[in-house]
Design a protein with these regions (language model features):
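Bacterial Sec-dependent N-terminal signal peptides
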Residues: 1-30
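Subset of outer-membrane beta-barrel
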Residues: 27-312
Length: 312
């Protein structure tokens, strides 16, 4: 019993460290692939089923996946002084690249059930949720945020882009142990339910600052943006679809977009202390119902005034 408590303490310590590292690193992936002290993360590799004969997973207690990638490290923008750590805006502009990418992916088991039959066969069923967000911002936008618009009469923003998606997956999985348990292979077949999809096709804005409006800086904005949206976001772009959402909400939410996908994974125990594994997950596609997809197009001009921020 004490040994199990010690293992759980070690596991919690590792999780806390990973969360801290995630906030500072440019690229991280947090997965639990082969833990005997907790339910294994079959989400990352369907061949990794652990030693349990039966598993029941619920949100927060089973498989999870958290990944983030960026072209910069948050720790590069931190300063420490007087025992305090804070963001240094002075570092923003010098560290900005021509393109600054940010990508984040989250996956979680909403429910999972697995059972081992005759030692070598493992069957599983479950529901997973996945969310992903991607943004790309130019160094001009970073400099505008860090330095303000007072010293920059005109800024052209045409390299910005964004992508986001959400979907659920109902899966059936199978894994088998081979070669005296040294080799494990597994796969999952998924029924995909699309929830949201958004992507920009074209962004082109010009911000021009008036140098004569004192004390406020008047900013004129001209340009255009084209984007595509589907699912709940797609309905938000169409007033008719938005009004009809509540008329049959269950049917609408289950028929916005559907598709098929699969996962495949292998794991090989080279020695008692060394194992190697590989997997391909979330391979598939979703076809969106045209009644729940729309295009967003914004063309025009605008003007706003910024009088500054008062600080002590």
């Amino acid at each position: 019993m004490l040994d199990k408590i010690k293992k759980m303490k070690n596991l919690l310590s590792i999780i806390v460290c990973l969360i801290f590292i995630n906030a500072l690193s440019a690229q991280t992936g947090t997965l639990g692939l082969a833990s005997k002290a907790a339910i294994p993360n079959m989400m990352a590799n369907p061949a990794q089923t652990g030693d349990a004969r039966m598993i029941i997973g619920l949100p927060g207690l089973s498989s999870y996946q958290v990944e983030q990638q960026s072209s910069f490290k948050l720790s590069d923008w931190l300063n420490t002084s007087g025992g305090k750590t804070y963001l240094s805006f002075d570092k923003f502009a010098p560290l900005a690249q021509q393109r600054n990418d940010i990508n984040a992916n989250i996956g979680i088991d909403l429910f999972s059930f697995g059972m081992r039959i005759k030692k070598n066969n493992f069957f599983s069923i479950g529901v997973q949720h996945f969310s992903s967000v991607y943004m790309s911002i130019s160094d001009d936008l970073v400099k505008l945020a860090a330095e303000g618009n007072g010293n920059t009469p005109s800024v052209v923003l045409n390299e910005e882009s964004a992508y986001a998606s959400q979907f659920n997956a109902l899966y059936l999985g199978y894994s088998r142990n081979l070669m005296d348990d040294k080799l494990k292979v597994g796969f999952r077949v998924k029924r995909l339910q699309g929830l949201n999809h958004f992507q920009t096709d074209n962004v082109n804005f010009t911000l021009t600052t008036s140098q004569t409006s004192i004390p406020a800086y008047a900013v004129n904005v001209t340009g255009s943006m084209k984007a595509q949206a589907a699912g709940i976001l797609g309905m938000a772009t169409d007033s008719v679809l938005s009004n009809n959402l509540g008329s049959n909400i269950t049917s609408n939410l289950t028929n916005m977009g559907n598709g098929m996908g699969f996962d495949f994974g292998v794991s090989y125990q080279v020695t008692d202390k060394l194992s190697v594994s590989a997997s391909a997950v979330n391979i598939g596609s979703i076809s969106w119902n045209k009644d729940f997809a729309g295009k967003v197009e914004l063309v025009g001009t605008g003007k706003f005034e910024f009088s500054g921020i008062t600080t002590d």
